[in-house]
Amino acid sequence: MGIIKTFSPSSNSVISIWKIEESLDELRDISKQITDIKNEIKEMEYHASREALKNGCKKLGIDFIGIEKDSNGKPYLKNNRTEISISHKFPYAVVMIHKERACGLDIERIDKKVLKIKDKFLNDDEADYIGESVKNATIYWTIKEALYKIEGEPVAFKKIIIKRSTSKNQFECRINRKNYTIEVDELDKHIIAYTN
């Protein structure tokens, strides 16, 4: 299917969403990228995310040459160290590009399995607030993943603080003494969280 949505959270950023409906061979032909990934789904996500990056770069007037990773494994664009964030949960590949500052983005499927791990990422206040809500637990997990990607360094998920939402889809958060506003959208039983 390709790009299903592109939008700009700010004048200096863009998010592109690719829905994978192509075969692996079709994605290889489209992306023209060579990889040694052995898992077919992971390779499909890889190619789709690169195509979503190309789309986002085009929207921001940036030449896409490829990506590299810093010493912590955080990706950035080769040609100008523009900040990027990449996430995928089959059949979606989602990318965010920001020209001026670090950005974070994540996508997760709404799935009851998240309740089995909630004690690993929710602090006591968050756990009390969420209770047994699969959707709310997924929202908090996705937000914390997005914030983790901003830092680019290991941080305990329980130390990422999510204040209650300021609106239906906006959350004020704190990580390592820095405040962030996170937007949350729902797409086909998936949650997407991204920095504002």
Q: What spans do the regions from the language model cover?
A:
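Core catalytic alpha/beta fold that binds nucleotide/phospho-ligands
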Residues: 1-196
